[in-house]
A protein has these predicted regions:
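Conserved phosphate-binding loops in N-terminal lobes of ATP-dependent enzymes
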Residues: 11-99, 226
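Phosphate-binding glycine-rich/basic clefts of nucleotide- and phosphate-handling proteins
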Residues: 160-241, 272-277
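Gly/Thr-rich phosphate-binding beta-strand-loop-beta motif of the actin/hexokinase/Hsp70
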Residues: 1-31, 136-168, 185, 215-221, ...
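Forkhead-associated
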Residues: 352-435
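Phosphate/oxyanion-binding active-site loops and adjacent basic polyanion-contact surfaces
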Residues: 71-83, 177-182, 240-252, 295
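Phosphate/pyrophosphate-binding loops at sites that engage ATP/ADP/AMP, CoA/4′-phosphopantetheine
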Residues: 83-96, 195-204, 252-267
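Helical "lid/coupling" subdomains associated with nucleotide-phosphate turnover
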Residues: 220-346, 363, 371-379
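Small-residue (GG/TT-enriched) beta-loop-alpha framework at ligand/catalytic clefts
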Residues: 98, 103-192, 272-273, 288-297
Length: 435
């Protein structure tokens, strides 16, 4: 019996169970007295604003729902319904380990556990998601995690003592959520449409929804290039990355104020969604983006210590640092992990010329830390650390390394460029530790 892993952040709830991976942002849409959640609900947010609720995780309580939304009495009913949908679509796991935000209050955690008791699965673990993520990194100084939710962002501060990552404090950043930043981005882009085409995509709900739908791909493109085109209803506007950098100003400034003056030994990590925000690298230099499956990786490696069967669940806010037992390339780049034992003896590994160290993958203007266990590159490929260095594994689109076809068992290092299929150029780099 496999345990499902549930990452609760309302900007993108995720569940992993066996080969299943579900993603479902915290949107609830009322359709004929029934609820739809996640991406289908988000796709109707501008079309049916009176039938949408996006606050039910953030404002989890048993107070009467205002404004009313169908048969739900309170936000707890909507949370219950989304959990049931995830359980149903995720293969109906019998047990779940949950990673939740440190911004959840004690009474909200108690209510969440009460809701889970009414679900067709058992919660066997409950952990602060920032601490779980922090255990993948660690720091000789302070470790900060920037979490972007729908209606606010959160800074969690942690320290590492005696090989354990411990939560110190949680600071909500009001008015800095994904929805507020999106609203500002759409405002800037709409102004560009009006200036360039005299067409205002926000005048009608349908074209406004189309603009919101186009936003993620446009931001990804701006992470690679300085300009991109956005097309809505046959009208096209040219958008410059620099024009959008002010949209995240409140978030970036609030995060800096919450962390205070950073010392060389301090470290800052952030949820992947933060990487879409223009200006991130310039306003928060040194910030490291988490991989998309970092929560899964952390929970899997910490699973034995998190599972609490046949007892009242405690909220875990301290975990062993995984880098004390797993060599991390961005911490100790010159030491390769020990080879795993093989059932069948392999032929001796031929000598491989030493490659320049690599700790990060440069994607446009954002440097993503490389994970020893593997970092997903897309289109069926990932890069992982072996006994001889960084190598690709997978099967998918054709791969070019330094503009030449990938060779079998090719070892990669700092300075090497990758291009998968028709995707953007990626480059392996070494980020020197701050001193």
């Amino acid at each position: 019996m496999s345990i499902a892993l549930l990452d609760i952040n309302d900007s993108n709830l995720q569940m992993w169970h066996g080969s299943s991976h579900l993603q479902s942002p915290g949107y609830a849409l009322l359709v004929d007295k029934q609820y739809r959640f996640g991406n289908p609900a988000r796709a109707a947010a501008r079309l049916q604003p009176r039938d949408i609720n996006t606050r039910f995780w953030w404002q989890l309580s048993t107070e009467a729902l205002q404004p009313a939304l169908g048969p739900a009495r309170h936000t707890g009913d909507l949370v219950h319904a989304q959990l049931q949908e995830l359980h149903r679509e995720g293969g109906q796991p019998q047990e779940v380990v949950m990673a939740v935000s440190g911004s959840m209050q004690r009474d909200q955690l108690a209510l969440l556990l009460g809701i889970v008791q009414q679900c067709p699965f058992a919660a066997v673990g409950l952990v602060n998601r920032s601490v779980a993520l922090g255990s993948l990194y660690g720091a000789s100084g302070r470790l900060f995690h920037l979490e972007v939710q729908l209606h606010q962002s959160v800074i969690c501060e942690m320290v590492q003592n005696n090989g354990e990552v411990q939560l110190q404090r949680t600071l909500p950043l009001p008015g800095t959520g994904l929805l507020q930043v999106q609203e500002r981005l759409v405002e800037i882009i709409s102004t560009a449409f009006i200036r360039q085409t005299r067409f205002d995509p926000r005048r009608k709900a349908l074209t406004e929804q189309h603009l919101y739908d186009a936003l993620p791909d446009a931001l990804r493109a701006l992470g690679r290039e300085s300009e991109t085109n956005i097309e809505v209803n046959g009208y096209r506007a040219r958008i410059n990355r620099a024009d959008l950098q002010d949209a995240g100003t409140r978030l970036f400034e609030s995060a800096r104020d919450a962390m205070g003056s950073l010392k060389p030994e301090d470290r800052v990590i952030a949820d992947p969604i933060a990487g879409l925000l223009p200006g991130l690298a310039e306003r928060l230099p040194g910030l490291e983006l988490l991989a998309a499956d970092s929560v899964r990786s952390a929970l899997e490696q910490q699973l034995d210590g998190l599972v609490q069967r046949d007892q009242a669940l405690s909220f875990v806010t301290a975990l062993p640092s995984l880098i004390t037992t797993t060599a991390a390339p961005d911490i100790v780049p010159d030491i390769a992990p020990e080879p795993r034992p093989e059932v069948v003896a392999a032929p001796p590994t031929p000598a491989v010329a030493a490659k320049p160290a690599a700790t990060h993958l440069l994607q446009g203007a954002v440097a993503v830390p490389l994970a020893t266990a593997g970092t997903t590159l897309g289109q069926g490929w990932e890069i992982h650390r072996t006994t001889v260095g960084w190598q690709l594994r997978g099967a998918g689109a054709a791969v070019l390394v330094n503009d030449s076809p990938l060779q079998p068992d090719q070892v990669l290092g700092g300075g090497d460029s990758l291009r998968i299929g028709d995707g953007p150029e990626l480059r392996l780099i070494e980020v020197a530790p701050q001193r």
